[in-house]
Amino acid sequence: MAEAASGAGDVTLEGERGKRPPPEGEPAAPASGVLDKLFGKRLLQAGRYLVSHKAWMKTVPTEDCDVLMTFPDTTDDHTLLWLLNHIRVGIPELIVQVRHHRHTRAYAFFVTATYESLLRGADELGLRKAVKAEFGGGTRSFSCEEDFIYENVESELRFFTSQERQSIIRFWLQNLRAKQGEALHNVRFLEDQPIIPELAARGIIQQVFPVHEQRILNRLMKSWVQAVCENQPLDDICDYFGVKIAMYFAWLGFYTSAMVYPAVFGSVLYTFTEADQTSRDVSCVVFALFNVIWSTLFLEEWKRRGAELAYKWGTLDSPGEAVEEPRPQFRGIRRISPITRAEEFYYPPWKRLLFQLLVSLPLCLACLICVFILMLGCFQLQELVLSVKGLPRLVRFLPKVMLALLVSVSAEGYKKLAVWLNDMENYRLESTYERHLIIKVVLFQFVNSYLSLFYIGFYLKDMDRLKEMLATLLITRQLLQNVREVLQPHLYRRLGSGELGLRTILELARALLGLLNPLRPDPRRHLEAQADEGGAGSRRCLGGGCGAPEEENEEEEEAAVERRPAGEGGEVPEGPRGGKEEDEEEDDDEDEDEEYEGEEGSLLDCGLRLKKVSFAERGAGRRRPGPSPDGLLEEGSPTMVEKGLEPGVFTLAEEDDEPEGPPGSPGPEPQTVLLRRARGEGRDQGPDGDRDTETGSGDAAGRQKRHNRSSWIDPPEEEHSPQLTQAELESCMKKYEDTFQDYQEMFVQFGYVVLFSSAFPLAALCALVNNLIEIRSDAFKLCTGLQRPFGRRVESIGQWQKVMEAMGVLAIVVNCYLIGQCGQLQRLFPWLSPEAAIVSVVVLEHLALLVKYLIHVAIPDIPGWVAEEMAKLEYQRREAFKRHERQAQQRFQQQQRRRREEEERQRHAEQQARRERDTGGREEARAEAPGPDPVAERGAAKAKGSERPRRPGALLPPGPVLRLKQIIPLQTRPPAPTGCAPPPRSPADTRLPAFLSLRFLKAPERGPSPPRPGKLFAFSAREPSANGAPGGGARAHRSAGDEPAAAEPEPRPEDAGHRP
């Protein structure tokens, strides 16, 4: 029997990927635990101990993973390989690992990136980072060219937060685009269409979400969730969850702080003005005017506070996106865009308008009619109850409570209807989609929440009844809201499917009352007594109804396995529990955990025992990893390279957790296990290598079932550790939708406070208490029960600010009408006629609107210091830009100068090389030719010299050559006596014209020299110059170009006849 059970266990293990959950139509297995009925098995076997946040401490942390991408368990290998190849080719900056989740039987991509790649991604994303003080301070978009100006850029751990890393990776994944004509199965992509959003919209990718960072999460649990009486760590929230979520909690905290004033003032009025009717009328009027002023001040002050936070987080002056991508859910006909000339989806606007007129509008009107009918039915029931004499006061409130319950339930239905209508209207952009969804939901909620109050106040004109109805709606809605957020959304799913009946609700109430009782008995003893009375073979715990057997049953099963005959192997099979010693140690550890954690720890231990049960039958089939002869896991494997995967894509985890067998058992297997044995083909072999015939049939069936679904992409089967990985646990959590639902709840509450609080002054106090709980419950929900959302950068709370401002204007009209029509004004001023009362109400309304407008104008939206800092930062940016432009221009000029110098140097080098080649060629030709004749060379040189054009100075005879400035005065001088040499002149005299020379003006007159026939100027053949050199001062001042002519040899007398 033991062998058969072991074989069956192997078959179940190998076929676990082929398992599917039972259809929803089939009845689920009965469970005795209340929490199991509420939450079910949706969160896998380990989902039952998610109630406690200490479940995080029991999971194996996931390292080297920022973003997790999971796929359904039915995804084929071709899809995984196609997407993996596109990611690695299209986004080489990412590091992708493929892993298989054992419990969910699904594949997942573990995505991360290096620090250098993240820096480039921050530059592409335009991520705003803090700038050092010496470079102007403030924040600006990151640039890799100027990375030195940013704070902490040298530190890899301090520069990027985990939320920023995940945002960069998400930006890359969303910008992975398809080429023209690409397709995956029946999904055909447009050119440049994002691949991953489209696959996620089609259901091929199950989810893409960032992974929690447990160290920071634990710190937030202590400083945020558990610190009830302290301020919220908004900066830490912004760094971890992003600006949008941090802005919501900042608004909620500011709203709660502002709610203190109307709560205190309303409580004082309610306490001291209930003596007589006149006091109540006065308090009603005063509190209505107070609420109008308070709501205006609150909204204006929040604008200033939001601007401060946006400036601090670097989103106040951030530029908007120039081009917004279409929604992945947008569908239409294919056409060529008239703007980009690329293929795109197009949905005609007339179809959307037709759907709005024929479907959306009629459904909205039908919903409003249904709300009105339900309201009238509850009011008729209320009248019937009030007509019966002698009923308790609590029974009189039952119709009001029923109406409040109907309003709360209808709100959920209306929200789903609004989402469906918005989807069917098929908006192209996400911003347009969100704006229309807000309009629909706000209109639905406004009518559904306030219709009964308007009916009582405007039609029945009964302030007492209005006060009771407002109190009932407000308190009931807040209680249901808190219960829903604490007990998880699965309660509603079970309620809708009929699995949550009256008996289960009573058991839940009894269990909650037992938890609140400090003197409650130990639930284990109660369950043991029930198990003994019923004779059940396995015990179930109250904490989760998980069906995990107790330790005694586990020990009995293991003892049965240990009593296996020696001929069947003779050794105790390896498994999670190798012997009784380990069982005792584990029991001692569990007892310590129970003593330390109390009831919460018992629930956690139940989940751990459940995991041990799920792996209890896998002990006989465990094997140690070893190298494969086929090279599947070897580095540089041809199989891996051929298929496009990296050798290290699969990670073997928990290899060192293999427990050793008892003394006498064989040691660890050698590391030469064949691939077939690593895949389970050698499991039915004994320690000596012989095949175990008893277990061969079961293992053969398991191998056959596994072979049918086996895939080469399957990673090697890891050690069967009972611990659950963090990534697998988070993939089972519910996704955090958005802040939309939270803002919607606060919008309804704000309307209750400002619209009708004059009838019930304690409404603000009830809202204050609810908000104090709401902050911590939302924080607890984000930190423990939901997946981590991607961070989004926003400037403010968006459209909700405008919606609440419109609510403030409407509050003035409603309160003034209630004052005029419900009798307060007539009772305070009985001498007023009806016409005068109406005029007084209109005047009061206009005065209130004027006061609201003056407050709006008087208080600027942006604080003065923020405006100054922004102006200073803008000035510094401009100056830095100018400085950058000058530096860039100087660098450009230097580059141009260096380029010209390099070109000039290259040109000179080429000329020099050419000159050397020519000189070398002439020398070679001269060396090859016979000896030259000196007379012939001299004649050739003369002929060449005569042919060469000469400058005018070279045509004159050698001797003292004067320039024009020396010639002009000589023409008017008398001829000098023969044989007298002219006085020497200094070089400075020859640089100035003669008529400007001081020496010339003071020199004595000289006689003209006798002219010589045939000569224009009286130049002697060889007249010594002033400096003793032939040629005079003119030749001394010749340019470099005249030097060759001056160096020419003196012609001989016999050649004088050849001169021109």
Curated annotation (Swiss-Prot):
InterPro entries per record: Anoctamin (IPR007632), Anoctamin_TM (IPR049452)
Modified residues (N-acetylalanine): 2
Tissues expressed in: Predominant expression seen in epithelial tissues.
Cytoplasmic domain ranges by topology: 2-244, 303-356, 422-437, 767-802, 858-1060
Membrane-side (Extracellular) residue stretches: 266-281, 378-400, 459-745, 824-836
Coiled-coil portions: none
A cellular component annotation (GO) from this entry: plasma membrane
UniProt feature, compositional bias: Gly residues: 534-547
PTM sites of type Asymmetric dimethylarginine: 991
Cellular compartment(s): Cell membrane
Record-listed Phosphoserine modification sites: 318, 665, 796
Transmembrane annotation, as ranges: 245-265, 282-302, 357-377, 401-421, 438-458, 746-766, 803-823, 837-857
Membrane topology designation: Multi-pass membrane protein
Predominant place of localization: membrane
Keywords tagged on the record: Acetylation, Cell membrane, Glycoprotein, Membrane, Methylation, Phosphoprotein, Transmembrane, Transmembrane helix
Biased composition (Basic and acidic residues): 14-23, 680-694, 899-927, 935-950, 1049-1060
Record: glycosylation sites: 708
Family statement: Belongs to the anoctamin family.
Reported function: Does not exhibit calcium-activated chloride channel (CaCC) activity.
Misc: The term 'anoctamin' was coined because these channels are anion selective and have eight (OCT) transmembrane segments. There is some dissatisfaction in the field with the Ano nomenclature because it is not certain that all the members of this family are anion channels or have the 8-transmembrane topology.
Protein name per its UniProtKB record: Anoctamin-8
